[in-house]
Amino acid sequence: MADEGLDYSILFNKDLPPPGGRFQGHPKYNFIGGHHDAELQPMDGFIESAANVFRGDPRNISMYSFEGPQGILPLRRFLADKLAKHRGINITPEEVLITSGSGQAIELINEVLLDEGDTVIVEKFSFAGALTYLRRRKINIIGVDLDQDGLRMDELAQVLGDLKSKGIRPKYIYTIPTLQNPTGTVLTMERRHKLLALSQEYGVPIFEDECYADLIFEGEYENAIRSLDDSNRVLHIGSFSKTLGPGIRLGYIAADWEVMCRLLTRKTDAGTGVMDQMIVADYFTNHYEKHILNVRAGLRRKCDALTAALREHFGPTVEVEQPRGGMYLWVKLPEGVDCRQFVGPAMQEGIAFNPGPDWSADPEAAANYIRLCFALPTEAEIWEGIEKLARVFQLDGGKA
């Protein structure tokens, strides 16, 4: 009798999410995720930097974490300089930990701070990955409303007061203050100061995620919340994946040693890829300013194209706020429309979009929202894809 093999279904972790499907290729009109524009990738510069790296010290490749577990010094030094110049954060390279993307940065902080059943405050609409991590840990997630100026401090104060009256102290306030994901808002400086004051009053740290802060379309914006902090209340993270591309899995955490020494005990991957670190350090040390100006200009053109396409093909039935930068538009559909029913029909037309519920502390509160990433598709694909998407919503009973 033939061996039928082992039935793994009886062995799987009982808390696993539903199984994933096989990769079927990318859709023609790809508005999901944090994909970047291939035309903006500085391949010649990467080739030059890679050549410089391969002529360097072979011990960086032959040893685990040759320059220590926090990452290579040239990249940490570049980050410390960049954060001081562009975000107002004065730290030393010893206060920087290089991570394998910002997702690892988030999970390392969760590992250090969270226990099952803890409470965390987030923005009402927030990064889907961060929300997923929290739900897997069985964390009580409380969403606080945003407006055009970012997280509302009046509502945050109310939530903190209510929790305190119940004897609950949140482990942190997770915020994306600069080009918020998914809404694109920028927290005003007045609110940044107020957020710090509330952190001090209630003894709750701030978890500041600035993955998109490089992507302002023009000028500069408010300094990071971490730059205002003189009492170790702010944990700050960022990423190279949005400045270069998600194929570069590099992020970072800026934290004081009291937290850093704990983070290092939870980073069990034997070190973030050294080759990526070395190439990015070499390239950005010499080309960062020119590169980021080129990226901002390219993203702005695509943002303008997507906004115009939505207005032409959806008309006044959708609400769209023009962001000051970033990679996304947060689109509000008419009340009563559930975007989830259009995911399948859209995919049949080669169109992929992110359903709003994935980006909300309360999924049902975002049923009539979609998030569109404009970085990857060409301007022609943006116009074609949005025209087709409008037809999908109309043909399948949507009000758009």
Feature roles, as predicted:
Residues 233-312, 319-323:
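PLP-dependent aminotransferase class I/II
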Residues 60-202, 207, 213-231, 299, ...:
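Conserved core of the PLP fold type I
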Residues 240, 317, 357-361:
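Short, solvent-exposed loop/turn elements at beta->coil junctions and helix N-caps
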Residues 1, 348, 363-400:
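PLP-dependent enzyme catalytic core of the Aspartate aminotransferase-like
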Residues 209, 356:
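Active-site glycine-centered loops adjacent to acidic/histidine catalytic or metal-binding residues
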Residues 9-100, 284-286, 352, 395-400:
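N-terminal small-domain helix-loop-helix segment of the aminotransferase-like
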Residues 317-350:
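Conserved PLP-binding catalytic core of the aspartate aminotransferase-like
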